[in-house]
């Protein structure tokens, strides 16, 4: 979203990428006005970005990226201005081959992908080997939800069910609840209560108010 503490460093970061010789394409996701701001900044400073640069507007909850191994989608947050978070989900992973066994049984190399996909193996002599015998279970796929400035609404946890890592802002201590409500932020206690509902493997807190000089207060 377009509160200054979340984007004002972006023009400098992009300029630094250029100075360091970046060549790969940069894809930026955000509200349309962010693109207008960047164009204004670059035009005012006569900056020409030398690497491929593409902007994708985020204006609703939708899928933003889908590849062979990851899916990224946006989720609407509840803040004073339009604000979105993101959910990153790894795709299910393939089974892992038991290298020692397949070597002993002389399973041909061309069949390895079939094993990874869960197929059983029939040897040249007609003997059936179950996939579970020749492979190990796939490694766990992880997911990460990034929720920046947000005043938690009822049923918001439904959008986050199943994520393994949850980042959620926790600007205030709970004694500042009236302030949190007024500014559309979340308290540490509320973020923790959200995590109890979502049940992630890990909760990460951040976006603390500058009034707190030491994290132990939180």
Language-model segments: which ranges?
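Di-metal (Zn2+ and/or Mg2+/Mn2+) metal-binding site signature of metallo-dependent hydrolases
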Residues: 1-19
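Active-site metal-binding loops of divalent metal-dependent hydrolases
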Residues: 2, 32-33, 101-102, 148-150, ...
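Hydrophobic packing residues within well-ordered alpha-helices of enzyme cores
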Residues: 10-13, 38-41, 156
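Short active-site oxyanion
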Residues: 24-27, 142-144
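Short internal beta-strands
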Residues: 25-33, 204-205
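A glycine-rich helix N-cap at a beta->alpha junction
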Residues: 46-58
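Binuclear metal-ion centers of metallo-dependent hydrolases, dominated by the metallo-beta-lactamase
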Residues: 60-62, 152-218
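Active-site-proximal loop/helix segment associated with metal-binding centers of metalloenzymes
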Residues: 70-146, 150-159, 165-167
């Amino acid at each position: 979203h377009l509160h200054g503490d979340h984007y004002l460093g972006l023009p400098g970061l992009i300029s630094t990428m250029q100075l360091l010789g970046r060549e790969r394409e940069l894809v930026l996701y955000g509200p349309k006005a962010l693109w207008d701001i960047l164009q204004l900044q670059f035009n005012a400073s006569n900056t020409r970005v030398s690497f491929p640069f593409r902007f994708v507007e985020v204006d609703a909850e939708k899928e933003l990226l889908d590849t062979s191994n990851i899916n990224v989608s946006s989720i609407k947050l509840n803040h004073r201005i339009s604000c979105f978070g993101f959910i990153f989900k790894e795709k299910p992973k393939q089974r892992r081959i038991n290298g020692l066994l397949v070597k002993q049984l002389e399973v041909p190399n061309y069949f390895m992908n079939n094993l990874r996909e869960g197929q059983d193996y029939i040897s040249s002599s007609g003997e059936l080997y179950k996939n579970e015998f020749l492979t190990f279970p796939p490694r766990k796929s992880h997911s990460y939800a990034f929720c920046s400035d947000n005043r938690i609404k009822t049923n918001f946890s439904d959008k986050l069910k199943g994520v393994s890592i949850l980042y959620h802002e926790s600007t205030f201590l709970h004694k500042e609840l009236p302030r949190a409500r007024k500014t559309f932020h979340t308290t540490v206690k509320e973020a923790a209560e959200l995590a109890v509902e979502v049940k992630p493997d890990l909760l990460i807190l951040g976006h603390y108010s500058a009034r707190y000089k030491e994290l132990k207060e939180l």
